[in-house]
Every structure is written in C-alpha cells, then in structure tokens.
Amino acid sequence: MTSQPDPRDDEANPLGVRLRERRRQLGLTLKEVAVGAGLSVGFISQIERGITAPSLSSLVSVARVLNMDVGAFLSQPRAEGGITRHDERPVYAVSPNSLTYERISASFPGNVLRSVIIHEPPGHRSEPIAHEGEEMFYVLDGAVTVEVAGERNVLEAGDSLHFPSTRIHSSWNHTDRPSTILWIGTMDVFGDAPPDGS
C-alpha cells in the first residue's frame, strides 16, 4: 500500500485530519467514502472535523475505502499466541473519550474470527453501518440496545445477538452505567490478516 500515516502522530495530527488528507490525496468526495464504507456522509464529515470518533469497525471500513490498513490510523496490540490473560491485556481506543477495547483473539493463517471486549460508556451510540461478514454481541455486564435492520433488541448481561453484518446495525448504551460487551466477528478489525485475506 502507499505511504501510510504514522499512527503515533495522533496528538500532532488528529485522526480526522489524517483521514481527510488521505481522502483528498485520492481525490475522493465525502460521498464516495461514505458509500464505500457503508456510512453516512454526515458521519464521515463529523469524523474529519473531529466532532465524533468512529467505532473500530467503522474506522476499518473507512480505511479500506482509502486503500489503507487500519494500522495506519490506530496502533492496536498484537496477539501473540492463542491465549490472552485478563490482567495483561492492554486497553486501547480509537480516540479519547470513546469506546475502549481489549483484543482477545489471535491471528494465524486461516483464522476468520476476530474478537474484542468493548467497554461502552453510558449514553454512547455507535453509527449505523453495514459491511461484509457476520458478528455476535454477548453482553458481559450492563445492558445495550442493538438495532439490526430497524429491529431494536435490548440485551442484558448474559444475552447475545448473532446477525449478518450486511444488515445495517448500530448499538446504544441506553443506561446510566458502563456496559461491557464481547464482540466476535469476521471483519478484520485488526488489519493483521495475511495479504490473501486468509
């Protein structure tokens, strides 16, 4: 891929600015990026202006349209081996004051599942998105509303929802407490799949 921004430049060059610079470098409009990423034009504009932060899956979708690896915009922990220890997993975020993540899956030849633990603050709403693959939400603590193709599902601790990611979906922590969710999906949210996609 072409020259990629250094994800460590976050403070000097915020995510939105770097995304806008790359979009302009490619001569793409906001609409072209939005359509390609399965997001709204308004949402892409808000990311570029630093008004909102994308979820991990939305950032991956935008990075793909911009012909970049998500690692160009976000430093994520690598998973060495197939085991992660609860007291050793780093917590990371796309931007300050957004969702935080703990990577719990590894990468190896042929793997198709990716998984993270998501810590969602009270009142947080994710943007509606549709993309390839499938995913599952399993609520570990708290509660969250997951909307899939217009159908709202309130999930509490112990509840799960499995659906094709090609259906427009979003989530919302409708409570006044943080929620913790195990997310499992086939989208390469880490950007470390082998080049052939396997």
Residue ranges: model-predicted function:
Residues V17-A34:
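Short basic helix-loop element that most often maps to the first helix and adjoining turn
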Residues P90-P128, E134, W183-G185, V189:
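A short glycine-rich, His/Asp/Glu-containing loop-to-beta-strand
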Residues L99, S165-G191:
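Ligand-binding loop in jelly-roll beta-barrel domains
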Residues E132-G150:
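Glycine- and acidic-residue-biased ligand/ion/polar-headgroup-sensing regions
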Residues A149-P164:
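Short acidic-glycine-tyrosine-enriched beta hairpin
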